[in-house]
């Protein structure tokens, strides 16, 4: 999860068109670098999935709703969208046909706990459907999770690109240099996930992946969170960046991250963790 969280933190000062910085030479961290709803919801998904391993879909979805509402209410001012912000406080929360990129930004834990691609896609669907039950919202989560799963199980970038294009129909032919000049703040999966995957595909290492994603502009924290989640699985995350990540979280959130790390380490889950 470090990849998603670091992408969120690094991208946070540059979110929205008025703050976009369309180059790579920016300070990776500043006093404005902070976690947002992307981090909170990723950790909520992780906690829910860890607590329901081996249980049925209904139990998993119930846990997702419970943990997302619990953590979301604990951190209320972290940039939630209008619909989602209302959903957090509903007594009987229902999905609302969203195709926003929130489904993709929070999905990474599903790709680490899954044992194969079929399970990856199934868990990704479940994490999306509790809010983002529009086909594009589900597709964005599944495409992101699939890329993470392929990356963490040793597949190369060409394989990842080909699978995403074939399975999900995303056009990954444009380069970042072609995307950057006209790209602007947009929050749909279909206009965020392909760009985030492209940023990963063009990157040289983990840090460069984050810088490339942020340099595209747009919804920079979410874009970088998605890119970072794939880049972590492919490159790993340098220890100094892990330390920086941990110190920018609250004790409550850092505890969830430690629990997550412990499970991946103890179970020797495949990947560059």
What does each of the following model-derived ranges do?
Residues 1-273:
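Structured, active/binding-site neighborhoods that engage oxygen-rich ligands
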């Amino acid at each position: 999860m470090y990849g998603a969280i670091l992408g969120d933190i690094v991208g946070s000062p540059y979110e929205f068109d008025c703050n976009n910085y369309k180059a790579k030479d920016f300070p990776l961290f500043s006093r404005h670098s902070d976690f947002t709803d992307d981090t909170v919801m990723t950790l909520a998904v992780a906690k829910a999935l860890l607590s329901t391993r081996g249980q049925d879909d209904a139990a998993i979805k119930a846990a997702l709703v419970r943990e997302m509402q619990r953590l979301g209410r604990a951190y209320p001012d972290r940039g939630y969208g209008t619909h989602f912000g209302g959903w957090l406080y509903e007594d009987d929360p229902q999905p609302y046909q969203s195709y926003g990129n929130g489904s993709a930004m929070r999905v990474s834990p599903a790709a680490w706990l899954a044992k194969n691609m079929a399970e990856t896609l199934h868990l990704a669907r479940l994490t999306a459907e509790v809010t983002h039950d529009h086909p594009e919202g589900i597709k964005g989560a599944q495409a992101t999770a699939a890329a993470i799963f392929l990356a963490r199980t040793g597949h190369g970038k060409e394989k990842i690109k080909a699978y995403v294009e074939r399975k999900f129909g995303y056009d990954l032919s444009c380069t970042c240099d072609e995307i950057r000049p006209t790209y602007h703040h947009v929050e749909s999966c279909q206009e965020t996930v392909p760009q985030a995957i492209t940023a990963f595909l063009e990157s040289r290492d983990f840090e460069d992946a984050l810088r490339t994603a942020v340099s595209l502009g747009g919804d920079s924290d979410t874009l970088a969170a998605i890119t970072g989640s794939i880049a972590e699985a492919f490159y790993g995350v340098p220890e100094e960046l892990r330390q920086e990540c941990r110190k920018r979280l609250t004790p409550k959130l850092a505890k969830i991250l430690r629990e997550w790390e412990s499970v991946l380490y103890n179970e020797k889950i495949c990947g560059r963790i």
